[in-house]
Design a protein with these regions (language model features):
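Metallo-beta-lactamase
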Residues: 36, 59-60, 66-67, 118-162, 169-170, 200-203, ...
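Conserved beta-strand hairpin/beta-sheet module of binuclear metal-dependent hydrolase folds
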Residues: 33-77, 165-177
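Boundary at the C-terminal end of the N-terminal hydrophobic targeting segment
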Residues: 22-26
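C-terminal regulatory/interaction regions
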Residues: 252-317
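Active-site HxH/HxHxD metal-binding segment of metal-dependent hydrolases
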Residues: 77-144
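Bacterial N-terminal signal peptides
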Residues: 8-19
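Divalent metal-coordination and catalytic microenvironments
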Residues: 40, 53, 63, 79, ...
Length: 317
């Protein structure tokens, strides 16, 4: 397969991944459930994880559910039954991706909507099916629920330019959506929207944070901080190996054969996602590096944007 075909294939994969969740709405979804993690923090959800924090003065709901699931309305009804007289005070969005924030408008009668400042523009432009946030922040924000503080913070562009982390220090819980999965696992199906180097730094920071015993990912079971280190180690190794092959003049077809990452094959989702991770890492590195033109021209051998079979080598300036 040529480089340009691989690029198109990876973009098609991204569309397939996104549309797959639309199709998921038409099949039987996992049942909604609530799990108490600490005295004040709960995980809820079905296909995706949300969370909520209960204080004396109100409840903060972090993330919605997949569109069409009616999951947030289900949660609102459950909260009324379990915590009568305690209003929803805030709704937080981990990032702008719709499958994690659908339905939060059901809390708009009492709750104020929060997101990172960068998320608001995406939500408006893409017409996300959620309430547009009225409160935005840049680096850090603390909300008080009455005896319980919830800290929302931004580590820079990582998975999207607006992904935030949510920390409840007194409960030693960190909500880290779409940045890790349970145990030792790949975190993402592919890396197309990843800011790679800052993600590596952020993963290291999250792996060392104090006052964290429980990590709530965006999908699957709860985990620990070690999962951040697993993901960081994989990304560091994948970047180094793909770059090494590119510097040696290898195209994506050869890289897919040589960069097998077999030493990470015990990671969850490895066999399903490794090919797309390699392809999208190559895409990131293609734009990251500036090849030395002499004795060859990597971009001449592996151009982007030209029809397959009609590319002539040239000696650029």
């Amino acid at each position: 397969m040529s480089a340009i075909v691989c690029l198109r294939a990876s973009l098609a994969f991204a569309l397939l991944f996104t549309s797959g969740y639309t199709a998921a709405q038409q099949r039987t979804l996992p049942p909604m459930k609530i799990e108490q993690l600490t005295p004040h923090v709960y995980r809820y959800g079905g296909l995706t994880n949300g969370a909520f924090v209960v204080g004396r003065d109100g409840i903060a709901v972090i993330d919605g559910q997949i569109c069409g699931s009616n999951g947030t309305q289900w949660l609102k009804d459950e909260l009324k039954k379990r915590f009568p007289g305690v209003p929803g005070k805030y709704t937080g969005r981990s990032h702008d991706h719709e499958m994690h924030i659908c339905g939060l408008e059901v809390f708009s009668d009492t709750a104020r909507a929060i997101s990172h400042v960068n998320a608001k523009g995406h939500i408006i432009r893409e017409k996300r099916r959620t309430v547009v946030p009225e409160i935005t922040f840049d680096e850090r924000m603390t909300i008080d629920l009455g005896g319980i503080e919830v800290v929302l913070f931004y580590l820079g562009p990582t998975h999207t330019d607006n992904l935030i982390q949510v920390h409840i220090p007194s409960e030693k819980v960190l909500i880290a959506v779409d940045f890790v999965r349970e145990g030792k696992s790949l975190a993402m199906p592919e890396l197309r929207d990843l800011n790679l180097d800052n993600s590596i730094r952020a993963l290291g920071y999250l792996g060392r944070m104090e006052d964290v015993d429980i990590v709530v990912p965006g999908h699957g079971g709860i985990t620990t901080q070690q999962s951040f280190i697993y993901v960081r180690d994989f990304l560091v190794a994948l970047k180094e190996r793909v770059l090494e092959q590119m510097v040696a003049g290898k195209g994506i077809e050869d890289i897919l054969k040589t960069v097998t990452m077999d030493d990470f094959s015990d990671y969850g989702w490895f066999h399903q996602w490794i090919r797309a991770n390699v392809i999208t890492m190559w895409e990131l590195m293609y734009h990251y590096r500036e090849p030395t033109l002499d004795p060859g021209c990597y971009e001449c051998d592996f151009p982007i944007g030209f029809p397959v079979g009609e590319v002539d080598k040239f000696n650029g300036p």
